[in-house]
Amino acid sequence: DEIDNVDLLVSNLTASSGGSEQEDDDRLRERIRLAPESFTNAGSRGAYRFHAMQAHPNIVDVAVLSPVPGTVDLYPLLSTGLPDGGVLTLVESFCSDEKVRPLTDTVRAKTPVKVDYTIEARITIYRDQDARSVKDAANSAIQNWVASRAATLGRDIVPSQIISALSVSGVYQVELVTPALRVVAENEWANCTAITLNMSGVSDD
């Protein structure tokens, strides 16, 4: 723009980052449920969880642990996965405010422990079914199951659930090769690194 014969150029010198999509209904409901916890600075688990989720719009879950009296460890999970150092610093700063925590508490923000696993299964279908269509349906179903595990912290990896998810219409039998049962701690995050579905045969039964 020209002002009094002076040309002004306005530009952003720093690349924008860290934006987020509009808050989804599940996250909004969770924040509303936790809101009464924010009225106290007595250091309840719910209060720390509420304030940690307020620190960044992409935080969808927070594990709150106290390994020793007076120390609170916060493990935030983002909608995009594990947090970076910037988010951890933000959460720690936000939850260390004296209006949030008791004076005797030391707050530490930590990265959730990633639990990698793979899914491999052998699928037998009915003879009159189209193998490609059944495989596509099974793949879609297991992708949804994997996403449900990754949406929050502490979701166990249960073989019977995987078999159930893969048992879509047209499937006669599912033989699961991996994974084995894995109980996931509340500060751990289940992360599927690969899915392999092998169409192993057909059945007339």
Locate the predicted segments by residue.
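An aromatic-glycine-centered, glycine-rich loop/turn in mixed alpha/beta architecture
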Residues: 136-205
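Carbohydrate-recognition loop of C-type lectin domains
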Residues: 37-155
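A broadly tuned preference for mixed-charge, low-complexity surface segments
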Residues: 24, 112-133, 167-184
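Generic structural motif recognizing short loop/turn segments at the entrances and edges of beta-strands
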Residues: 4-7, 70-72, 103-105, 115, ...
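Compositionally biased, intrinsically disordered low-complexity regions
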Residues: 20-21, 83, 172, 203
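A generic structural micro-environment signature
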Residues: 9, 38, 42, 65, ...
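Beta-strand/loop-dominated core regions that host nucleotide or nucleotide-derived cofactor-binding catalytic loops
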Residues: 1-14, 88-93, 191-202
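Catalytic P-loop NTP-binding/switch module of NTPases
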Residues: 1-36, 43
